[in-house]
A protein has these predicted regions:
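Acyl-donor (CoA/ACP) binding surface of acyl/acetyltransferases
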Residues: 1-30, 67-177
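A short hydrophobic/aromatic micro-motif that marks alpha-helical segments and, especially, helix-coil
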Residues: 14, 42-43, 56, 175
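Hydrophobic residues in alpha-helical segments
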Residues: 26, 35, 56-58
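Conserved GNAT-fold acetyl-CoA-binding loop/helix
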Residues: 30-53, 64-66
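Short loop/turn motifs at secondary-structure junctions and domain boundaries
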Residues: 56-61, 146
Length: 177
């Protein structure tokens, strides 16, 4: 798959050589406190990255888990995911390394992923499930025009406890970018 470019980010396929950058994100409690998984150690990150690379090679891939980089630097600063769910819908997810928060990278990467979901993937609806305390991520989807749909109680188990999620969605006709 060709890389997808935004104003601030480039989303490309992961490579096994991205392990150190991937671990710096997926192994950081500041990041994973907002994710649906606990922080990875090196072995778990290596296993996860190998699975991501393997899925990207499948003809009918189950998801598009892409590395987020900057246009002037190929180092991974985050990841974004579009996971088709059903014929016309997809789930959106993203994470940016804590050292890169506050620069618009998550919003830009999510915008790029939405263009991919509504364009080449032909999706009608994209959803995002976000922890109620994750104000930064809620801000991302609001900036992109998502609509709040509801509160999912004890939706994910992570970091040793059940966590609620807020469900947001965007329909293709509402997508403006």
């Amino acid at each position: 798959m060709e890389a997808l470019s935004g104003r601030l980010t480039v989303l490309r396929e992961f490579r096994t050589t991205d392990l150190d950058d991937y671990l710096a994100i997926a192994g950081d409690d500041r990041v994973t406190t907002w994710m649906a998984f606990d922080s990875y150690d090196r072995a778990k990150a290596e296993q996860s990255l190998a699975a991501i690379v393997a899925r990207s090679a499948q003809e009918n891939r189950p998801d598009y888990m892409l590395a987020v980089t900057r246009p002037d630097d190929d180092r991974v600063i985050g990841f974004g995911r579009i996971a088709p769910s059903g014929s016309w819908t997809a789930k959106l997810g993203y994470a940016i390394g804590a050292d890169h928060w506050g620069h618009g990278y998550a919003t830009d990467a999510a915008r790029v992923l939405l263009g991919f979901a509504f364009g080449p993937l032909g999706r009608h609806r994209v959803t995002a499930a976000i922890g109620p305390e994750n104000e930064a991520s809620i801000g991302v989807v609001k900036r992109l025009g998502f609509t709040y749909e509801g509160h999912l109680r004890e939706h994910v188990f992570t970091n040793g406890a059940w966590r609620d999620s807020l469900l947001y969605s965007l329909l293709q006709p509402e997508h403006t970018d």
